[in-house]
Swiss-Prot record:
Homodimer. Quinone reductase that provides resistance to thiol-specific stress caused by electrophilic quinones. FMN binds at residues 9, 93-96. Its cofactor is FMN. The keyword Oxidoreductase applies. This is FMN-dependent NADH:quinone oxidoreductase. The keyword Flavoprotein applies. The gene is azoR. It comes from Bradyrhizobium sp. (strain BTAi1 / ATCC BAA-1182). GO terms for molecular function: electron transfer activity; FMN binding; oxidoreductase activity, acting on NAD(P)H as acceptor; oxidoreductase activity, acting on NAD(P)H, quinone or similar compound as acceptor. Its EC number is 1.6.5.-, 1.7.1.17.
Length: 201
């Protein structure tokens, strides 16, 4: 089976989401050696944001070399996603949402006829059967029931987007409060890794 591993944190070595996404992938591979892993670091190799030229080229308009290269990058991203059985995404919360690098990747996936279609009764997701696991880190506490829950446009957005594509199995391995001191940070990471181990079992 194929596993797509995505990282989007700009924090590098100190990134909690990178630590957690790597842990999730390691646990999955430990449980099943047959995984074929494709890795994309959206910070080391960022995708450009959508342009009018890119959209026009997808519809058959003439394109210069730069736009053709951009289209090729988008098609490669789409192929990786469509081929994957499981997608593990390192997605920190930045300013209540997701990193712009991750948003650029997501924008390459929302393509009518590829990942969703419009039917008689509205949009229909075409990616049923896939599984998404999100390694989520937040400096504060934003989970349901917290005073800041209404500001969560990170996990809620990802849940909505992948659900729109027809993916029903979406899990979050969450470390919250990682900016609230070393003790809270350590406990949050340990709890997230414990949850990851249960998901991979």
């Amino acid at each position: 089976m194929k596993l797509l591993h995505i990282d989007s944190s700009i924090a590098g070595v100190g990134s909690v989401t990178r630590e957690l996404s790597a842990e999730i992938v390691a646990l999955l591979k430990g449980a099943d050696k047959s995984w074929n892993v494709i890795y994309r670091d959206l910070v080391a190799e960022p995708l450009s944001h959508l342009t009018g030229g890119y959209l026009a080229a997808l519809q058959g308009a003439p394109a210069d070399q730069a736009v053709q290269a951009d289209v090729g990058a988008g098609l490669a991203v789409m192929e990786d996603f469509l081929a994957a059985d499981v997608i593990v995404i390192g997605a920190p919360m930045y300013n209540f949402g997701v990193p712009s690098q991750l948003k650029a990747w997501i924008d390459r996936l929302a393509v009518p006829g590829k990942t969703f279609s419009y039917g008689e009764h509205g949009p229909v997701g075409l990616c049923k059967g896939k599984k998404v696991i999100v390694a989520s880190a937040r400096g504060g506490i934003f989970s349901a029931g917290s005073p800041l829950a209404a500001l969560d446009h990170q996990e809620n957005y990802l849940l909505s987007f992948f659900g729109f594509l027809g993916i029903a199995e979406i899990s979050f391995v969450r470390a919250e409060g990682v900016a609230l001191g070393p003790v809270v940070r350590a406990k949050a990471i340990a709890a997230a890794k414990e949850h990851a181990a249960k998901l991979a079992a």
